[in-house]
Design a protein with these regions (language model features):
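Outer membrane beta-barrel
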Residues: 3, 18-121, 133-151, 174, ...
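Short, solvent-exposed loop/turn segments at conserved positions within beta-propeller repeat blades
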Residues: 130-134, 164
Length: 293
């Protein structure tokens, strides 16, 4: 299986710029035994920002997953979206266990593939060099009853600032209203403040209506979300908004996706973010079309 996504992003404000690229992904999987399987994903990213049309191809996923009794085990390089993605949504080289039926829990230990911006610099070739360990321990709890889902998580990013860990606690939930509407929110708390104003908290809440389904022509979805997060409350945020220079952000995002025809889906998003501890401001227009096969 696979997908091809063509994307254009335009940013005005502090991080002014644009991105235009084509991302192609191919998924490979095989059964190792009755209980275990291997999964890999090969990704090619071709940038159209310059006349060079630069391209790179890498294995972005390579992991094994299976069951050991009542415990699900995953190990290798895989994508880990924790909770609502407001703290971490990125690739990780690690090991994860999931268990529980009514009250579900998970524990993971590994090294985020995206590194640690607090301990990084660009070398002469433009490569990101990380100067310290960026291992992390992440544990989660999820509980669903009726239309309500509760989730909580604890993150410990080691040696995140100097020799100190960044420890983040989150608690959140969602409510399904019928089959089409979902309200969701999350509170976040860190053990240190990244900005001089002393803030170390965050809150995110939003609404989703329906959602585009690639196999269902004419299906669509609408979402809106409000964000207010200190820089210490996220490591690799799930948002598509550009906010690199804001060092924490306060603002909103809205989006609309639509299935044009079977396996062809379009997405348009808009974000308006203010910097938490600066006069910086970013407005992001994101648009893409994804072909699945």
């Amino acid at each position: 299986t696979g997908e091809a996504r063509t994307r254009y992003v335009d940013v005005t404000g502090t991080d002014k710029g644009y991105m235009a690229d084509l991302r192609t992904r191919l998924w490979l999987s095989g059964q190792v035994s009755d209980d275990w399987r291997y999964v890999a994903m090969l990704e090619n990213l071709q940038s159209f920002n310059t006349n060079k049309e630069e391209s790179e191809t890498k294995f972005r996923r390579a992991y094994v997953t299976g069951n050991a009794g009542d415990i699900k085990v995953t190990g290798g390089r895989y994508n880990y979206t924790v909770g609502q993605g407001n703290v971490f949504d990125d690739g990780i080289d690690g090991v994860q266990i999931d268990f529980g039926k009514v009250l579900k829990a998970s524990m993971a230990y590994g090294r985020p593939a995206g590194g640690n911006d607090f301990h990084s610099f660009q070398d002469a070739g433009g490569n990101t060099i990380y100067t310290k360990n960026n291992d992390a321990f992440i544990t989660t709890l999820d509980y669903k009853t009726g239309n309500f889902t509760f989730n909580a998580a604890f993150y410990d990013f080691l040696d995140y600032v100097g020799n100190a860990d960044n420890k983040i606690w989150t608690v959140g939930g969602s409510i399904d209203i019928g089959d089409t509407v979902k309200l969701h929110g999350e509170y976040l708390k860190s053990n240190f403040a990244a900005n001089t104003d002393g803030e170390d908290e965050g809150i995110v809440f939003g609404l989703n209506y329906k959602g585009a389904e690639p196999e269902k022509k004419g299906s669509y979805g609408i979402w809106a979300k409000y964000y207010n997060q200190d820089r210490s409350t996220y490591v690799s945020h799930t948002t598509d908004a550009v906010h690199d220079s804001l060092w924490g952000f306060d603002g909103y995002g809205v989006g609309f996706d639509y299935t044009i025809t079977k396996n062809i889906t379009a997405l348009v998003e808009y974000f308006d973010f203010n910097g938490k501890n600066s006069e910086g401001k970013d407005k992001t227009w994101w648009s893409d079309v994804t072909f699945t096969f």
